[in-house]
């Protein structure tokens, strides 16, 4: 449980950092220690809603090119009417709402989410998320994957 809160705290810190344009590395690739700093403007990409959700979103895939990293850390900004399509979850995944409002559906149950809400979706569950209202819905997404070489 403590690990989840630590990951969530890091996610909130990174998402609230100001946007710049350069990736920083403290140590050459393959050496132990150090850090990687990526900024919103470096990784922002206009994308349709994932899982066939539709609409316009801006996806931020932080550290996607970092070797040997199991942690996936993303931010997504949903424009009005956009969504993550309803799909089956394969691994634990955390959604954290930074701003805006959304309608989440998990295993057929709908509920509204807003700033400060964190939702853990478990393997085997089905879920989707739709932006509601006039303001963009901005969320953080975190899950583990097999590390990339």
Residue ranges with predicted function:
Residues 1-7:
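Bacterial N-terminal signal peptides that target proteins for export
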Residues 8-17:
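Bacterial N-terminal signal peptides
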Residues 20-70, 149:
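A short, N-terminal "cap"/entry segment at the start of jelly-roll beta-barrel domains
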Residues 63, 83-89, 130-132:
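Short histidine-centered beta-strand/loop micro-motifs
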Residues 67-68, 123-148:
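Ligand-binding loop in jelly-roll beta-barrel domains
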Residues 72-89, 123:
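Conserved short histidine dyad/triad with adjacent acidic residue
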Residues 90-93, 97-102, 107:
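Glycine- and acidic-residue-biased ligand/ion/polar-headgroup-sensing regions
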Residues 109-124:
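Short acidic-glycine-tyrosine-enriched beta hairpin
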């Amino acid at each position: 449980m403590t690990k989840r809160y630590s990951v969530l705290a890091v996610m909130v810190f990174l998402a609230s950092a100001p946007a710049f344009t350069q990736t920083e590395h403290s140590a050459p690739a393959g050496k132990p220690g150090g850090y990687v700093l990526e900024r919103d403007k470096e990784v922002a990409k206009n994308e349709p809603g994932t899982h066939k959700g539709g609409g316009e979103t801006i996806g931020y895939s932080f550290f996607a090119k970092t070797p040997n990293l199991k942690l996936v850390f993303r931010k997504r900004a949903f424009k009005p009417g956009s969504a993550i399509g309803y799909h089956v979850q394969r691994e634990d995944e955390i959604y954290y709402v930074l701003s805006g409002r959304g309608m989440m559906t998990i295993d057929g149950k709908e509920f509204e989410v807003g700033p400060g809400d964190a939702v853990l979706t478990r393997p085997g569950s089905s879920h989707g998320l739709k932006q509601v209202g006039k303001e963009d819905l901005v969320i953080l997404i975190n899950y583990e994957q097999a590390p990339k070489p």
